[in-house]
């Protein structure tokens, strides 16, 4: 048996590899910067490659098979964020466990395929803005003070306790209970002095009853008090938002109760969410967007006890993927974050800054939005959505990209206040999601809440294909990202299929026909919903809008589905090779391994396609970007997720697309 490589051996090997890349100054146990200035960090880099005084690469070793794990990678990335001095975080991160290499670009907050050489790192690294530098260093300090590698483990333990001993089943209901407790914790931080005005705890400060000590002291008597408190807080005006129907909704249904009945489990849950730093000081879960700019006037105490939203959101995302039961609606398969990130990065990379900052009253936007009055005219014109949103994973991915773009320092024409106001408006008006499962909508609201948004337009519908409220958004979306339900013959609603034949509404895939001969079309009595959702999403896009959609490979290759491909691209002229007709231009096709959705219970072979709705019927089909993702970052063994030693091809795929030739871009 081969002797297991030690961390020291890996460090020595890493030093040699860095030398081969041309780095001359390589320091072991490199002392990292303390942004708080109080000596509390006491953090070091196992190995640091520098160019003069400029920190370039931070290396971190890991035990065999551990390098692919998010907590290990996060620890290295946040160490790199501390950097060598004020304003000097490391630019790149390398995590290695002797079998697996993982490289990250700190400015892009993204995985990269390789490390740059010592001679070329400056050209490979984009300049880091001042506000981004402040953010990276402060967030890194927060991470190391709080040791947030424990958050996801706590979520797992809480779910098990709520499910097995708290009397809350099935598993999705247990997830809802955890979401409710997170919601109450966020409210406590936003309104620490809140006094209850109704229920059994009327007149008491919420902070007094939402504590493990109080619950243990009061026992079962505390349960109805907290149930009443949850009902009151859930219905506060600050957590209400009007959807496109004009109806108000709250984070949870207005009459949804807190279901935990076991006081010991409730106390345990409250205690577990009382996150503290190494000095025992409380850490906040909620982060105002101003803090993301890094230019708020904050005391050292406030600065040191913030938790960045990405840390909590990451933990909840990992937890949700591992626990969510896929038994609601037509099909509920949680899209892995690796796929979401790839699709979001590719699509937002093609969105112009002018589109993100456009107003509905702008000359080139008025026809699309037809605003009524000045207030409506001043709203963002950009609209992104997912009409099969499930737990909101694509909406979270879009929100992350929006924040990254809007808060970027390169917008020299916009003040910090302008950016914050605009981002706030975009959160309310630029994201839309719908789903037929109310449980999924509730989880989407929690997912968005943990990423800093509690007013997203999320709509419970009976059928996203036929919903009349969604009809009002036809022609308005800039971008749709989605993973719809699929399965041959799974959609059988006669009214829905009849509606998908309404050519006056721009719909036509309620028919099928032999490829090349639409005159022989026939009505479908049942259909794969994936094909129908292509049509519905195209209807919702503005001319020139983009759709990125996960599809079963049959739609892309089966002869019986050739009419769908023809509907999208048109028919190919045998003489010119050009496609005639068709509703869209295909930009990219990315084939996914059959393991991609295996944790969700299916090994179906899938791909995602990136198509752009034609602005004019004569728009030509341009060269298509094709890619194959044989590895998506993980393997599965039963219900467990294991790191893929071959890494994540989707990282390279997104980077290659964004760096592609102009005729593809």
Protein language model regions, located:
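Charged, often flexible domain-edge or linker segments that flank or initiate folded functional domains
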Residues: 57-61, 67-68, 77-78, 83-246, ...
């Amino acid at each position: 048996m081969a002797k297991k490589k030690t961390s020291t051996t890996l460090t020595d090997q890493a030093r040699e590899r860095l030398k081969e890349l041309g780095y001359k100054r390589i320091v072991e146990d490199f002392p990292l910067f303390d942004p708080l200035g109080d000596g509390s960090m006491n953090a070091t880099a196992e190995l640091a490659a520098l160019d003069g005084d400029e920190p370039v690469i931070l290396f971190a070793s890991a035990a065999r098979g551990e390098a692919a794990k998010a907590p290990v990678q996060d620890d290295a990335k946040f160490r790199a964020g501390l950097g060598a001095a004020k304003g000097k975080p490391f630019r790149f991160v390398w995590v290695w466990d002797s079998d697996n290499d993982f490289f990250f670009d700190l400015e892009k907050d993204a995985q990269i395929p390789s490390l740059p050489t010592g001679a070329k790192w400056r050209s490979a690294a984009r300049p880091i803005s001042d506000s981004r530098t402040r953010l990276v260093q402060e967030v890194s300090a927060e991470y190391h003070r709080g040791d947030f590698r424990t958050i996801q483990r706590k979520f797992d333990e809480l779910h098990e306790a709520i499910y097995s001993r708290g009397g809350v089943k099935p598993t999705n209901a247990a997830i809802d209970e955890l979401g409710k407790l997170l919601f109450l914790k966020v409210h406590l931080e936003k309104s620490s002095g809140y006094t209850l005005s109704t229920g059994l705890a009327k007149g008491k400060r919420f902070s007094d009853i939402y504590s493990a000590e109080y619950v243990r002291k009061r026992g079962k008597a505390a349960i109805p008090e907290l149930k009443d408190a949850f009902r009151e807080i859930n219905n506060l005006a600050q957590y209400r938002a009007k959807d496109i129907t004009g109806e108000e909704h709250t984070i949870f249904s207005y009459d949804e109760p807190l279901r935990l009945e076991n006081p010991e489990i409730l106390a345990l849950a409250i205690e577990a969410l009382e996150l503290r730093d190494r000095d025992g000081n409380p850490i906040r879960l909620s982060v105002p967007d101003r803090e993301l700019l890094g230019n708020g006037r904050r005391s050292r105490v406030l600065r040191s006890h913030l938790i960045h939203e990405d840390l909590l959101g990451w933990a909840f995302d990992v937890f949700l993927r591992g626990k969510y039961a896929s038994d609601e609606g037509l099909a509920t398969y949680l899209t892995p974050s690796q796929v979401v990130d790839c699709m979001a990065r590719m699509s937002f990379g093609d969105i112009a800054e002018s589109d993100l900052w456009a107003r509905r009253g702008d000359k080139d936007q008025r026809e699309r939005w037809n605003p009524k009055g000045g207030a409506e005219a001043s709203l963002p014109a950009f609209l992104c959505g997912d009409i099969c949103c499930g737990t909101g994973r694509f909406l979270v991915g879009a929100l992350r990209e929006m924040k990254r773009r809007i808060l970027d320092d390169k917008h020299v024409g916009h003040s910090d206040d302008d950016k914050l106001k605009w981002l706030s408006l975009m959160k309310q008006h630029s994201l839309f999601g719908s789903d037929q499962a109310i449980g999924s909508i509730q989880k989407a609201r929690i997912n968005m809440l943990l990423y800093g948004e509690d007013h997203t337009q999320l709509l419970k519908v009976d059928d996203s294909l036929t919903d009349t409220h969604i009809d009002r958004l036809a022609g308005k979306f800039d971008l749709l990202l989605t993973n719809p339900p699929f399965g041959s013959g799974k959609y059988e609603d006669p009214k829905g299929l009849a509606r998908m034949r309404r050519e006056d509404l721009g719909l036509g895939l309620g028919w099928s026909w032999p490829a090349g001969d639409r005159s022989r079309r026939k009505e479908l009595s049942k259909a794969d919903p994936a094909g129908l959702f292509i049509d519905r999403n195209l209807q919702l896009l503005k001319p020139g809008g983009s759709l990125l959609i996960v599809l079963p490979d049959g739609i892309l290759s089966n002869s019986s589905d050739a009419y769908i491909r023809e509907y999208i691209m048109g028919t190919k002229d045998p003489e010119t090779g050009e496609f005639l007709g068709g509703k869209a231009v295909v930009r990219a096709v990315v084939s996914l391994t059959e393991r991609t959705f295996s944790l969700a219970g299916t090994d179906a072979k899938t791909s995602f396609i990136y198509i752009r709705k034609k602005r004019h019927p004569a728009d030509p089909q341009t060269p298509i970007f094709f890619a194959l993702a044989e590895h998506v970052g993980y393997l599965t063994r039963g219900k467990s997720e294991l790191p893929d030693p071959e890494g994540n091809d989707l990282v390279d795929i997104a980077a290659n697309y964004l760096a592609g030739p102009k005729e593809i871009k």
